[in-house]
Every structure is written in C-alpha cells, then in structure tokens.
C-alpha cells in the first residue's frame, strides 16, 4: 500500500544525531570541569566531546541539506521553522552582546576609585579610534551591502552575480578579521589590565568571534550557490546567513562608539 502525504509538513525520519549531540555536550561539560580542576583525562574528554559535537553538526546539517535540496521536503510551511528559529537565535545574541557593552558603559560612566576615578584607567595606553577601528568599521558595513547585493542577485535568478557578491562579502570579512587580529597584536594592554582590558577584549572578541562564524556561514552559502543548490524560491539558508551578517555588521557600530571612541578620545 502506497502512503500518501496530504499536508505540507516534513515528518523527519529517525536520526541518531540528537542523541549523539547530547552525548558530545555531556562529554564536553564533564571534560571541561575535570580539566579546570586538574583531573587526569579531563583534557582528553573535553577534546573528544568537542570533536563529537563538531562531527554531529556537520552530518546533521548535511542531512538537512539533502532533505531540502535532493528530497524536496522543505515546503513553504516547513521553511517558516528555520526562519523563526534564526530570528529567535539572533535576538538572543543581541541580548548577549548587549550585556558586554553594558558592562563597558557602566565601568566608563561610573569609574571606581580603584582605577583612579577616571576612564580609561590611569596607566592604560588606549588604541586610537581614528586608525584601525575607524578603517574596520566601513569595511564590515560594506560587507553588509555586498551580502544584500547577493540576496538581490539570487532573487533575480542571476547565479554568477550572486557568487561574485558572496566572494566580495567573504573577502571583506577576512580583511576585517585580519585587521582585528593586527589590532589585538599591537594593543598596548592585555585582558588582565584592569576592567578596561577585560571589557575591551570580551566585547570586541565576542563580536569578532561572531564575524568568524558568519564568515564560515557565508562560505558554505557561496559553495552551495556555486553548485546551483539555491534558487529564488529556496534559499532559507542564505537568508539566515544574511540576517546574521546584518546583525554582525550593525552591532559593530556599538563597540566603535562605546569602546573605541568613548574610551580612546
């Protein structure tokens, strides 16, 4: 008897990846605690847990791409789930970064007597916001314009143009990351140099980490676009990457104003 599906939802097949991801998370957590408390085998368990999680992420997303690209299970109704999930994830990341910027603002607006009652603290050599920070900001904002160009190209059915736009986006992202690394290397202070160093590296480093994740996301989208796996009707993965990237480039304005400019002028 042939089974027929009379709805637009995707009933997924049994998968081992949820339980494998859970086991990887368990191993990572236990291994991390053991490593921090100098228990024997903690580093090994932590490494195995991280490898297990990365492997699970790879094969799980591979299966999702197969279900959408080759099997056609991602109808318009199914596509709403990843869209809502991506928006919820980005909102949670906004809250995360807001906490770091709030910590920096709190310390700068009400400096304590332990740091001399001034901001930046006495003895801290700060970075000039008119140099690399000022250069890096328009670079990242330009990458946001490039990813919008790629989106319009996909909607217009211009596959090659979309690939070129994604290459431009990734190139600008790599330039930004390179300058960020140069900035860290040349910084006259470290993360342990008072509350200024702690909030600076925590906030800008967390944002830089998001840039790296977004760059990997866009590289995968560029490869899929080159292989012809995205169309103007089916490109939810790219939409999620574009939304994430716009979040990353807009957020850049906050550390530039609240950390580089406020703490460096």
From Swiss-Prot:
Its main location: mitochondrion. Pfam families: COX3. The keyword Transferase does not apply. The chain crosses the membrane at residues 16-36, 41-61, 81-101, 137-157, 162-182, 200-220, 245-265. One of its GO terms (cellular component) is mitochondrial inner membrane. InterPro entries: Cyt_c/ubiquinol_Oxase_su3 (IPR024791), Cyt_c_oxase_su3_dom (IPR033945), Cyt_c_oxidase-like_su3 (IPR000298), Cyt_c_oxidase_su3-like_sf (IPR035973), Cyt_c_oxidase_su3_a-hlx (IPR013833). PROSITE patterns: COX3 (PS50253). It is a multi-pass membrane protein. Its EC number is 7.1.1.9. It catalyses: 4 Fe(II)-[cytochrome c] + O2 + 8 H(+)(in) = 4 Fe(III)-[cytochrome c] + 2 H2O + 4 H(+)(out). It is an enzyme of class 7 (translocase). One of its GO terms (biological process) is mitochondrial electron transport, cytochrome c to oxygen. It is found in: Mitochondrion inner membrane. GO terms for molecular function: cytochrome-c oxidase activity. Keywords: Membrane, Mitochondrion, Mitochondrion inner membrane, Translocase, Transmembrane, Transmembrane helix. Component of the cytochrome c oxidase (complex IV, CIV), a multisubunit enzyme composed of a catalytic core of 3 subunits and several supernumerary subunits. The complex exists as a monomer or a dimer and forms supercomplexes (SCs) in the inner mitochondrial membrane with ubiquinol-cytochrome c oxidoreductase (cytochrome b-c1 complex, complex III, CIII). Belongs to the cytochrome c oxidase subunit 3 family. Component of the cytochrome c oxidase, the last enzyme in the mitochondrial electron transport chain which drives oxidative phosphorylation. The respiratory chain contains 3 multisubunit complexes succinate dehydrogenase (complex II, CII), ubiquinol-cytochrome c oxidoreductase (cytochrome b-c1 complex, complex III, CIII) and cytochrome c oxidase (complex IV, CIV), that cooperate to transfer electrons derived from NADH and succinate to molecular oxygen, creating an electrochemical gradient over the inner membrane that drives transmembrane transport and the ATP synthase. This is Cytochrome c oxidase subunit 3.
